[in-house]
Amino acid sequence: MGYTDQRFDVNLSILFTELPLLERPAAAAAAGFTAVELWWPWIDTATPEQSELDALKKALEDAGTQLVGLNFYAGQLPGPDRGAVSVPGEESERFRANIDIAADFAASVGCKALNALYGNRVEGVDPAIQDTLALENLVLAARAADRVGAILLIETLNKPESPLYPLVSAPSAIEVVDKVNEATGLGNAKFLLDIYHLSMNGEDVSQVIAEYAAKTGHVQIADNPGRGAPGTGELPLEQLLDELKKAGYDGWVGLEYKAADAAASFEWLPAEARPAS
């Protein structure tokens, strides 16, 4: 098995960021990749102009790259925010305004996975109120995703780097996944299994894979420590991806790591393994 048996995509919100957004798909293609993913690209607005959406679609198509994962609006990310789903007031309103825009854009480019970051705890707000709001918003997002034939992803982050984010263990994210599926009856809410975040939380990644592979809709990787490319840290990433394969996961593996020189950071992956089949 090994890396050559996986389907990798490049996260263009963390790699190739030295380039303007519309140049990044071509850079990923030049490095040999045919699949990419993105955080919400317009951090200052949940409702970009149609011309901006069209320009990104054209950049993806011109590069011959398939968008396989897209975040809903998530506030200032990169930045201090970790989503808007559970944040009362204007941020929740922005998220709701973004739902159909993100879903329709995903449909226009054939993207089948939409990620909704839960949002930080807000000082002075009862966590139960935030959780109720989150479920309401995630139900709306799941229905929109289903309308365009996509899944809704729920992600665990890590407590050291995101201390106000409440979903900092696999079970906490799975609980939300199950609640959304119970509320909608659609079954399209899935776990985003990020090996870097799980390891930063001190979780047994192999155990998480064994328990939750069947509920996993997308995987992301970076090595630890450092959040760099595979081989720069201490995680047995190739082994863990093999475990995912053996557990039945055959979806995408997003490369969501930091690198000063993105093109040079792919040396660990043979060129023939980069195009998605």
Language-model features, listed with the residues they occupy:
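N-terminal small/glycine-rich loop or linker at the start of catalytic domains
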Residues: M1-L12, N71-S86, Y118-V122
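Glycine-rich, proline-tolerant flexible connector loops at the mouths of alpha/beta enzymes
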Residues: E37-E61, Y118-V122, D126, E161, ...
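Glycine-rich, aromatic-flanked loop segments that form ligand/cofactor-binding clefts
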Residues: L60-A74
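Conserved beta-strand positions in the central sheet of alpha/beta enzyme cores
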Residues: E37, G69-N71, N115, L153, ...
